[in-house]
């Protein structure tokens, strides 16, 4: 059995290679970076919602950094949405850092609740494959803008946060069990 594999075009004129399915090297995989050691979420829950928020920020950043590193090994040259620089830029902002971060389909959202049902604050930021970032307002739902950098996107979301007293972080029902 013969398979044709089409790796990303390297520019040297070779855009396909043929691999024999019986070749012993077909089962060899490229070495991947070790999985990160994530924070102990159960211990964080026992200390309260603020610790859950901090542990989840750390967990998200480590997890997405690892996924990005794996992507670079498995799919060299293919674009990867800018979720890692987005998480770094958002984590650098104290007003966002105190909210529970969550991701869905690469989009970053911020909740004042540490569990479902989420209480999403402000809006969301979606890293695009072209390297830009799309910012959406939550209510009423609307695209606020598309910007070049993660820092610009974070600045737009900060403008969407309510003024006045900071949102109170609440634990999910599961955290009280």
Could you say what each language-model-derived stretch is?
Residues 3, 7, 115-141:
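Short aromatic-glycine-(Arg/Gly/Cys) micro-motifs in beta-strand/loop hairpins
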Residues 4-7, 20-23, 27-115, 174-177:
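Negatively charged, low-complexity tracts enriched in Asp/Glu with abundant Ser/Thr
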Residues 74, 125-127, 152, 161:
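General N-terminal targeting signals
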